[in-house]
């Protein structure tokens, strides 16, 4: 690809991850809602609404990325994220908050699988796809460090209040949108827009043409638009059909997605419930933010360490991560806040240790044409597991 600087593209993707996930309001949304007077039951229902909306949007958003292009889909994701924050600022009751939460889920869905697909295809376009292992590890580490840093700012977000906190998220969302616009699209997608035109020039030219030429040109323009619409429709159909056949005939991919979702759901919910259990276990509330930050560093470490074991069989990752998550789950019942924090650290480490390897494995298995769609199927599987596990673990813990 001419004039394509792969290093610049990858660095922009790293920067995008760093900017996108520094959301001080998003990282402390539970505490902000509680501060506004919402009950834990209402917050739990809103969490379910997020995952239900996510499960509805996940696969269609992947199809959109495969059909219209990764860059456009990422730009739409950032725009929807900004609108979600704006909706949260304007919300004044449970219904409007639920609407904002659903919009937030759509933003995550549009990004899920898309940034990974763009990174992989960028490297593949210059025959450097073997470097995706290192990219995935570093990207996951940046995501965890950034999101953990945002969590560390939870006290600051509460001090600011939800409106100012979400305004800061909007600011970083606009920066992220600017970064997306500077990215290079890789694959030759057929878009929905045509060539740019100058209306005044077109009108002047038409006046000098004969009526026959005008009619012929209009017919050609109409035919081109019809062909474009047919191509988009066919691409939607082909992506969905081929993705379905891939999942139906690839038992290994299905198994990988399910196991990854189960381990990831347990780890995620352990961290979620520790936000409530740590203060009850005697941890000073002022230390809650730093405690969550430390646990998040476990995930960053797990994402980075996985790069040192590229030749391990996938079963080894499953066994090690499974043991780590089970230990984390057990430590939440110790009653000792420091053991619980250690458990959260271990669980986060195990989760991302498996997650990064799963991402690499699936990208190697998936055809480029359906990459975003099938990675979205992976996220969809996680959402379904979360809907069930949230209630189950909530009753146990």
Language model features with spans:
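Transmembrane alpha-helix termini and helix-breaking/packing motifs in multi-pass membrane transporters
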Residues: 35, 147-168, 279-281, 386-397
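C-terminal ends and interior cores of transmembrane alpha-helices
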Residues: 79-92, 323-335
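Juxtamembrane intracellular "pre-TM" segments in multi-pass secondary transporters
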Residues: 1-7, 186-257
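Symmetry-related core transmembrane helices of the 12-TM Major Facilitator Superfamily/SLC fold
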Residues: 165-182
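Helix-loop boundary and gating motifs at the non-cytosolic
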Residues: 2-55, 250-293
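Hydrophobic core of transmembrane alpha-helices in multi-pass small-molecule transporters
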Residues: 18, 95-111, 339-353
């Amino acid at each position: 690809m001419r004039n394509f600087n792969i290093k610049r593209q990858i660095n922009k993707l790293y920067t995008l991850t760093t900017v996108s996930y520094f959301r001080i309001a998003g990282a402390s949304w539970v505490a902000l809602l509680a501060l506004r007077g919402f009950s834990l039951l209402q917050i739990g229902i809103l969490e379910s609404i997020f995952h239900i909306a996510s499960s509805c949007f996940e696969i269609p958003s992947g199809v959109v990325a495969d059909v219209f292009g990764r860059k456009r889909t990422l730009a739409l994701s950032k725009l929807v994220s900004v609108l979600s924050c704006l909706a949260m600022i304007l919300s004044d009751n449970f219904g409007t908050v639920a609407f904002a939460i659903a919009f937030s889920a759509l933003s995550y869905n549009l990004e899920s699988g898309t940034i990974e697909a763009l990174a992989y295809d960028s490297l593949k376009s210059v025959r450097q796809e073997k470097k995706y292992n290192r990219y995935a590890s570093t990207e996951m580490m940046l995501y965890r460090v950034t999101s953990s840093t945002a969590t560390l700012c939870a006290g600051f977000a509460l001090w600011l209040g939800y409106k100012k906190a979400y305004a800061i998220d909007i600011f970083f969302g606009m920066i992220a949108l600017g970064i997306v616009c500077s990215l290079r699209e890789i694959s030759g997608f057929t878009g929905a827009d045509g060539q740019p035109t100058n209306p005044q020039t077109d009108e002047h030219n038409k006046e000098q043409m004969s009526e026959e030429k005008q009619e012929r040109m209009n017919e050609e323009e109409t035919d081109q638009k019809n062909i474009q619409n047919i191509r988009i429709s066919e691409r939607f159909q082909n992506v969905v059909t081929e993705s379905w056949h891939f999942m139906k005939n690839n038992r290994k991919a299905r198994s990988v997605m399910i196991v990854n979702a189960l381990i990831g759901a347990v780890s995620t919910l352990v961290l979620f419930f520790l936000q409530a259990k740590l203060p009850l276990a005697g941890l000073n509330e002022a230390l809650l933010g730093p405690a969550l930050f430390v646990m998040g560093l476990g995930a960053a470490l797990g994402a980075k360490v996985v790069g040192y074991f590229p030749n391990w069989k996938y079963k080894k990752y499953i066994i090690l991560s499974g043991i780590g998550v089970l230990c984390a789950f057990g430590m939440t019942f110790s009653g000792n806040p420091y053991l619980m924090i250690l458990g959260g650290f271990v669980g986060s480490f195990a989760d991302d240790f498996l997650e990064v390897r799963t991402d690499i494995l699936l990208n190697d298995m998936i055809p480029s044409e359906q990459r975003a769609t099938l990675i979205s199927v992976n996220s969809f599987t996680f959402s379904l597991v979360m809907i069930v596990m949230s209630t189950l673990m909530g009753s146990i813990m």
